[in-house]
Amino acid sequence: MSQRSTKMGDTIAAIATASGAAGIGIIRISGSQIKTIATGLGMTTLRPRYAHYTRFLDVDDQVIDDGLAIWFPAPHSFTGEDVLELQGHGSPLLLRQLLTRCLDLGARQARPGEFSERAFLNGKLDLIQAEAIADMIGAADLRAARAARRSLDGVFSRRCEALAQQLVRLRIHVEATIDFADESLDTLDRAQIRTSLQTLNVELTQLLRDAEHGKRLCDGLYTVLVGPPNVGKSSLLNALIGSDRAIVTDVPGTTRDTLRESVHFHGLEFVLVDTAGLRGEGDAIEREGMRRTLNELQRADLALVVLDACDPQIGSLALADALTSVPRVLWIHNKLDLLTEPPSVLDTDVIPVSAMTGAGLDTLKTRLRTLLLGETVETIEGEFSARLRHVQALQRTAAHVTDANAQFSYEHLELTAEELRLAYKALGEINGSMSPDELLGRIFSNFCIGK
């Protein structure tokens, strides 16, 4: 039995609303001691899913607060256990006093994310849906919130489950032929397995692409500004975010550390990272800044290579090498206002701008939006939220399917079946069916207390 099983009989409680004073505050309780706690608070009768107005009493029958109590009996509750929600005034002092009373009556303080964890362990949610709750709460824009809503509704889960069933059927088919190893694989069986492998690969590739898109929607496009010193990277960052966040001087090498700012263009989130200019000289601190610049490029979704429009030279072999591993690169010719003649730019990946006057910034923002969403936005209704671990698990799944295809080409049926088993295992990590306890602990520990 899993160490994280909820079959331990304990009852958990936590404040479920945000910290600070508010009109309403909620305490959520889940577990087998609900009726004992309700009685201790002064409630004698509770009807399922009915809002009871009541007074919440302390050990001396003094009123802590008054409000509504709602009982959700198991298994028809969020966690799958008996759940009691207490809705009172949003005073932090009163909420803490009421929570303490619940703990005195037999509950314990819930861990971060423990309510969602219990919902997962009791089969009320899969892991994708549990994570979608946190993604919806933390969404920085409406589109990301709607994508998280679709994951909570099961859009991502159903696609993963469909692929898992295909993997199972295909593995059964392959293993059935192993019993006849002394016979050559007939043409019909060979064609069916080959077609199934190809179909699986196509659908996995599409799901991986959609998951990468979902991750960008939730996390924002991680966009790193790089280039030689004194080309206006910090000025461009300030212009894009609309404030003087980065220090700007005429002295090359002013920026020596990375600076991150989240910004929204067209309702979409971007994480902009200003970095130290790359050149072959500088003191120890500046060299450390350049090292950090190269490290940032390793995690970048997009690199904005900022060059001086008057002399657009990259000037760094290290930067040129690092850019080869970045998924998307956009070239920015800054200081457009200093040109005596209009720029003759033919490359669509080059955008002339002026951080000083704002010329070209709207074009840049529109291009950034296109890079995040793709060339079309016709897939809005199918969008779902995703995380880095989902993308990585799909990548491992796809790699095993590719290896299965290769092994099948050599009629290595045992190895083909094994690769399909490993693909199924990797895919199962996404919805939690194959996730170890340690991974579950890390995931739920990042949730809010009370969720």
UniProtKB/Swiss-Prot annotation:
Kindly report, in one word, the top-level EC class recorded for this enzyme: hydrolase
Which domain of life does this protein belong to?
Bacteria
**Sites where the protein binds GTP:** 230-235, 249-255, 274-277
Q: Which UniProt keywords apply?
A: Cytoplasm, GTP-binding, Hydrolase, Magnesium, Metal-binding, Nucleotide-binding, Potassium, tRNA processing
Subunit organization: Homodimer. Heterotetramer of two MnmE and two MnmG subunits.
Note the Pfam families from the entry: MMR_HSR1, MnmE_helical, TrmE_N
Q: Return one Gene Ontology term, BP aspect.
A: tRNA methylation
Keyword hit for Cytoplasm:
yes
Q: Where are the transmembrane segments?
A: none
PANTHER family per UniProt: TRNA MODIFICATION GTPASE GTPBP3 (PTHR42714), TRNA MODIFICATION GTPASE GTPBP3, MITOCHONDRIAL (PTHR42714:SF2)
Residues reported to bind K(+): 230, 249, 251, 254
The protein's required cofactor(s) are namely: K(+)
Q: Which free-text remark accompanies the cofactor?
A: Binds 1 potassium ion per subunit.
Q: What does this protein do?
A: Exhibits a very high intrinsic GTPase hydrolysis rate. Involved in the addition of a carboxymethylaminomethyl (cmnm) group at the wobble position (U34) of certain tRNAs, forming tRNA-cmnm(5)s(2)U34.
What the record says about family reads: Belongs to the TRAFAC class TrmE-Era-EngA-EngB-Septin-like GTPase superfamily. TrmE GTPase family.
Originating species: Xylella fastidiosa (strain Temecula1 / ATCC 700964)
Location in the cell reads: Cytoplasm
Residue sites binding Mg(2+) per the record: 234, 255
Q: Binding positions for (6S)-5-formyl-5,6,7,8-tetrahydrofolate?
A: 28, 85, 124, 451
**What EC number(s) does the entry state?**
3.6.-.-
What is the protein's name according to its record?
Answer: tRNA modification GTPase MnmE
SUPFAM superfamilies membership: P-loop containing nucleoside triphosphate hydrolases, TrmE connector domain
Q: Is the keyword Membrane assigned to this protein? A: no
